[in-house]
Regions:
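An anion-engaging/catalytic patch
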Residues: 1-108
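Well-ordered alpha/beta subsegment
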Residues: 105-120
Length: 120
């Protein structure tokens, strides 16, 4: 795991403390994600609103009017839309965090993909 270890740890802490079950999905509130990306929550919500087609129901739900919860897919989609340097770093760390969790449990996404025995 390369990158900003303090940011990685902040993401890990936020996920452990702020994640909750909503409508059968594990989610995090937009306000908590905004804190990690260091963007104003209104900016984050505007980004979601203006890119609604990028957030299907398995990525995001609207908790209250204009207040959102995001799954891991929504968190990753949002990170790709934000432009600040901190947001770019946080986006990379979120990806590394989620992949780290898979590897920690002995799972690799590539191991799950059927390759028909293709090798170089």
């Amino acid at each position: 795991m390369e990158g900003d270890i303090s940011l990685f740890l902040a993401i890990e802490k936020m996920m452990q403390e702020k994640m909750f079950l909503h409508q059968g999905k594990l989610v995090v509130k937009d306000v908590d994600i905004a804190g990690v990306y260091e963007v104003k929550v209104n900016e984050l919500r505007t980004k979601i609103k203006n890119n609604r087609s990028r957030f299907p129901s398995d990525f995001m739900t609207e908790l209250n009017k204009g207040e959102y919860t995001l799954t891991e897919l929504g968190i990753l989609m949002l990170g790709g839309l934000l432009k600040s340097e901190r947001a770019k770093r946080a986006h990379i760390q979120f990806i590394e965090y989620f992949v780290h969790l898979l590897h920690e449990n002995g799972v690799s996404v590539f191991d799950l993909i059927k390759t028909n025995g293709n090798e170089l």
